Design a protein with these regions (language model features):
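Phosphate-group recognition and catalysis centered on beta-loop-alpha active-site segments
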Residues: 1-272
Length: 272
């Protein structure tokens, strides 16, 4: 009997640890009401209309004029400017080698997006274009302490005077933690996916949302293919809002609408 009690105590302790690690924010941020049923154009409405590369001003305008929320990605440049761009490197979208964070804004403005005449926009240019017409989901692209705090600080300096609605999210828990500490008024989210086969214990911890104790996110944005992840479901059960990414077809977009009240899509235009 004592052995059984010991086992139960150990299991209870493990459960308590998991709950502590996975628990989202205790609060219910008022902006979660906006996220309920919200659909978001991934990097703007790109790949649908001519001459609208991802994360470009035309792609943002195409979404905004249709009343569709927009997901954007932001990096910090070598000279401390905040630009809207997804990849860490420039080869896929600009056809040149190089790391975006090693370039100055001036150097980046000489490049073109996806073989078009459009340039890499700054965060300021994006905000001026959207001007509060639709909500923005801003992903902070950082993977290290070297860029995390500078990016968060620089972006916040720009965003603090923005009158429109925005949410922040990141795969990097310290970036979400920065907003937890310094901008409690902003609805913050932890991005994740099923990285169980990736090398590194930190990737497995991210997949299981075991780093939530750092950021206590208001919502969890998870790759929809891994909807059944028990840790994701536990986090939602504990009170996190559920957001899913990235849907590329109408069938799955509709299929997972209940599991993910907020859905990010690309390569098609959802039916109204």
């Amino acid at each position: 009997m004592q052995f059984l009690y010991a086992i139960l105590i150990v299991l209870a302790a493990l459960l308590a640890i998991v709950l502590f690690l996975v628990f989202p924010a205790l609060r219910r941020h008022p902006d979660r009401k906006i996220m309920q049923g919200l659909i978001i154009a991934h990097r703007g409405l790109h790949s649908i209309f001519k001459d609208t590369p991802e994360n470009s001003l035309p792609a943002f305008e195409a979404a905004a004029e249709r009343g569709i929320a927009i997901e954007i990605d932001i990096h910090i440049t070598r000279d401390g400017e905040v630009v809207v761009f997804h990849d860490d490197t420039l080869d896929r979208m600009c056809g040149v080698s190089g790391i975006i964070e090693d370039k100055t804004l001036g150097e980046l403005k000489e490049l073109s997006l996806g073989g078009t005449n459009h340039k890499i926009p700054t965060l300021t240019e994006c905000l001026e274009l959207v001007n509060g017409r639709v909500p923005l989901m801003i992903e902070f692209k950082t993977k290290s302490p070297k860029t995390c705090v500078p990016l968060c600080r620089a972006a916040n300096e720009i965003l603090k005077n923005y009158k429109g609605k925005y949410f922040m999210q990141s795969f990097y828990p310290p970036a979400v933690m920065w907003y937890r500490r310094h901008r409690k008024d902003i609805c913050r989210g932890q991005l994740s996916s099923g990285y169980f086969k990736e090398k590194g214990i930190h990737m497995k911890a991210l997949s299981c949302l075991l780093l939530n104790f750092l950021s206590r996110p208001d919502f969890v944005a998870y790759e929809y293919k891994y909807e059944s992840n028990p840790f994701r479901r536990l986090c939602v059960l504990l009170g996190a809002h559920s957001s899913g990414w990235t849907f590329t077809d109408e069938e799955n977009f509709e299929k997972y609408s209940k599991a993910f009240p907020t859905r990010t899509f690309e390569k098609f235009l959802p039916k109204e």
